[in-house]
């Protein structure tokens, strides 16, 4: 706790301090840019030539279905599948209808199953029954087969006992075999045991897989080179976007004006790029990066620095959504409020320029107001000493975790669908949005509740569950981890049941959940980004792949 005066606060008040570390990047992304494409028309020509070669490989008719399945999977895992969405969909439809899978071995069946389920095709897990022996047990010692089986099990839904058995079997075998494996299979297995592909940020997974694939004796040279060039080309685009975001952040001078808050514009960009990296979603990334930046400042103000009176004034100003309201909030908050209004006004202008209409901006503003209300409730928990029930806490945290907001804003930014109907549906917090939000909350609370308690907070999913069900801290944490698995199964199930409206929400729900899995796998990688988060950002946004 500290006595602090910021802005024009009229009196000293006791305020908390989370002691967040300063940015680990300084002005690096403000000045750095890739020279990969600079005066290099030959690279663009080579990229186009290789893309056509890969497309030809993908669409050519063949009776060798296992090879076609492996090629399709490699294209997706290498991060270049977005170039061939139509062709991949056509291939998967053929593979879904084909009965020759009865002749596939366990390795090919596992890849086939994961590919199809991962793209929304309903495939029964009974396809694995024929790989059990007379004792009802799986039996294989082949590491590559075990790796593929393990990856496939993470698309399981509730009640699939055979996949529950398969995940235990394959994990145990892989852990035992790992020390004996050599590159690149050892890294493939290690990565999967750490974060399986289905739960990994797809851009990060591609960065990991590109050198692994390149070392395979059976690699296709044109595909390997295409993946490297495409990664570096996309990285150059992402660097330009982050440079623009860093310039905006610096112009507002948020770090010096709000020293109690997290200075994490690069980490926020990594978050949004992880959710949708494709070039066509540049507008959405730009908007969402600024949104996560301003939301993070508001969150820290409500959680750490602001008094209850101050944050209540800010909440009221957000409800008014009027520049005149800035006069009614403390001076130190005004830069946040002005920045917030500016983001939405800029986004509105971009929507009009890009699509000729801006009706969706009302959805964006409303969902932003909703998250501020949820922050207000959490501030009231702390300042009044009110302890909510577990269900009450979770109901509010589904909103305060931000994933409903991010999913809806991402849908608006992407603009691919009949938006009004989709946004009306997503605003009701349907099952896939709820599952994604709950996974985010459980993961977040497991990694942050102790740090929050050190600064005086006593309300978290862990503590509320302990209090309500009279269990130990260890038991409550175990329950949270079990709930993460339950919600992942529910999320998987909703993707298989998606209709025309809900299918547009599948990818945002999955990708935002994946980002949380990765960002919080070794702690709160957003608040403390000095370790593995910094390394991952550097791999994606700083270091090009050698060609």
From Swiss-Prot:
Binding-site residues, Mg(2+) 3: 444
Molecular-function GO term, any one: magnesium ion binding
Enzyme Commission identifier(s): 4.2.3.87, 4.2.3.93
Catalytic activity: (2E,6E)-farnesyl diphosphate = delta-guaiene + diphosphate; (2E,6E)-farnesyl diphosphate = alpha-guaiene + diphosphate
Pathway: Secondary metabolite biosynthesis; terpenoid biosynthesis
Stretches of the chain forming a coiled coil according to its record: none
Annotated domain remarks: The Asp-Asp-Xaa-Xaa-Asp/Glu (DDXXD/E) motif is important for the catalytic activity, presumably through binding to Mg(2+).
Function per UniProt: Sesquiterpene synthase involved in the biosynthesis of delta-guaiene (78.2%) and alpha-guaiene (20.9%), two structures composed of five- and seven-membered rings. Also produces 0.9% of alpha-humulene.
Protein name: Delta-guaiene synthase 3
Native source organism of the sequence: Aquilaria crassna (Eagle wood)
Gene name linked to the record: C4
């Amino acid at each position: 706790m500290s006595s602090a005066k910021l802005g024009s606060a009229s009196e000293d008040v006791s305020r908390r301090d989370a002691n967040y570390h300063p940015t680990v990047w300084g002005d690096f992304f403000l000045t750095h840019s890739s020279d990969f494409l600079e005066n290099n028309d030959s690279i663009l020509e080579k990229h186009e030539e290789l893309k056509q070669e890969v497309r030809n490989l993908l669409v050519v008719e063949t009776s060798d279905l296992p090879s076609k399945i492996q090629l399709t999977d490699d294209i997706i895992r290498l991060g270049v599948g977005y170039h061939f969405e139509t062709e991949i969909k056509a291939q998967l439809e053929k593979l879904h209808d084909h009965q020759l899978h009865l002749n596939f071995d366990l390795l090919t069946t596992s890849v086939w199953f994961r590919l199809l389920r991962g793209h929304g095709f309903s495939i029964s897990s009974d396809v694995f029954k024929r790989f059990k022996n007379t004792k009802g047990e799986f039996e294989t010692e082949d590491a590559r087969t075990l790796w593929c089986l393990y990856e496939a099990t993470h698309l399981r839904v509730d009640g699939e006992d055979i996949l529950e058995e398969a995940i235990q079997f394959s994990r145990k075998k892989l852990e035992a075999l790992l020390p004996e494996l050599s590159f690149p299979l050892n890294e493939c297995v290690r990565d999967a045991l750490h974060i399986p592909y289905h739960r990994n940020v797809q851009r990060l997974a591609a960065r990991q897989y590109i050198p692994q694939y390149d070392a395979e004796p059976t690699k296709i040279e044109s595909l390997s080179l295409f993946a490297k060039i495409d990664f570096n080309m996309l990285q150059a685009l992402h660097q330009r976007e982050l440079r623009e975001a860093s310039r905006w952040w610096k112009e507002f001078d948020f770090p010096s004006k709000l020293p109690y808050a997290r200075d994490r514009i690069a980490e926020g960009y990594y978050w949004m790029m992880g959710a949708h990296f494709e070039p066509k979603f540049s507008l959405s990334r730009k908007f969402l990066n600024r949104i996560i930046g301003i939301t993070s400042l508001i969150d820290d103000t409500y959680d750490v620095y602001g008094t209850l009176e101050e944050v209540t004034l800010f909440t009221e100003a957000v409800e008014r959504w009027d520049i005149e309201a800035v006069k009614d909030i403390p001076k130190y908050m005004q830069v946040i409020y002005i920045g917030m209004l500016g983001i939405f006004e800029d986004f509105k202008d971009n929507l009009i320029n890009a699509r000729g209409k801006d009706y969706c901006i009302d959805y964006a503003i409303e969902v932003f107001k909703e998250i501020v209300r949820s922050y207000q409730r959490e501030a009231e928990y702390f300042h009044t000493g009110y302890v909510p029930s577990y269900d009450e806490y979770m109901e509010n945290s589904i909103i305060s975790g931000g994933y409903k907001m991010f999913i809806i804003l991402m849908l608006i930014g992407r603009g691919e669908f009949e938006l009004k109907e989709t946004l009306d549906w997503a605003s009701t917090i349907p099952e896939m949005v709820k599952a994604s939000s709950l996974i985010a909350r459980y993961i977040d609370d497991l990694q942050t509740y102790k740090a929050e308690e050190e600064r005086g907070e006593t309300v978290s999913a862990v503590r509320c569950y302990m209090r309500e069900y009279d269990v130990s801290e260890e038991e409550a944490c175990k329950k949270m981890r079990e709930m993460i698995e339950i919600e992942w199964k529910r999320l998987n199930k909703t993707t298989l049941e998606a209709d025309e409206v809900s299918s547009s929400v599948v990818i945002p729900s999955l990708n935002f959940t994946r980002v949380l899995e990765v960002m919080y796998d070794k702690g709160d990688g957003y608040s403390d980004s000095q370790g593995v988060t910094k390394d991952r950002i550097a791999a994606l946004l700083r270091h090009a792949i050698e060609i």
